[in-house]
Amino acid sequence: MGGMAEHTQLIDAINIRTAVRAYDDEPIDDDTARQLEMALQPINLLGDLNIQLVRDQPKVFAEANASGHLTNAANYLAIVGPANDEEAKERAGFYAERMVLTATLRGLGTLWVAGSWDKAEAAKHCRVTSGQELYLGVVIGHPKNHLDYQAKSYEELCEAQRTHRATKTYEQFTATMSDEGREAAPDWFKSGVEAAMKAPSAMNRPPITFSYNPADDTAAAHIDQSAEDEHHAFNDMGIAKLHFQIGAGQGQWDLLDGGLFIHK
């Protein structure tokens, strides 16, 4: 049984990440905060975003903490970017989820939040310049009983991920494809979809589907119109595309609905 030490890849993080709603009340220390902020710099640069780490603001989650929906939520990544910009919202999902996976490898828990926080209160504690908006947030902190969590092996954490929630099936994630098409798709596509199946969603219902086009050996991502999640669909698409890209191994996405993935 391998411990977590040798599991340093983003695909390892995908295999163990779960939505964490209960946290220990131990704060994120300055050293960890510094490391997270260092990891944020290139992400903000690449994504043209303004994602910020905010610590020790339990008031933002007062209602969710009081109702028991969350426990001890107090820190968050404020996902800030250009206002009214669908491409930027997708980039925010893609790059902020990279931070989520980085935090996962550090033993921290995370949860994407769109509804279960006081957004106006959250905005008070971060910089939102004119022309920018606070899209949504990611709760971050030490998972409840985090010493027990850290003592678990990679295999145990993978097993916990597998049984964490009912996920949509591979068929649902490739809804527009025929059985023959699924069968004929290359391994990199299947691995990409499997990684995307493990992606979180701001609204807890992934509205993204993938398809493979054998004619030019590309994949495409689509917003599932039946999911009725217009508001955060582009954010969720960015999250799912990052997972797909890591699972597929090599390649690059075009942005937006119907964007193509070219496998290298």
Question: Where do the language-model regions lie?
Answer:
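Acidic, surface-exposed loops and disordered segments
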Residues: 1-264
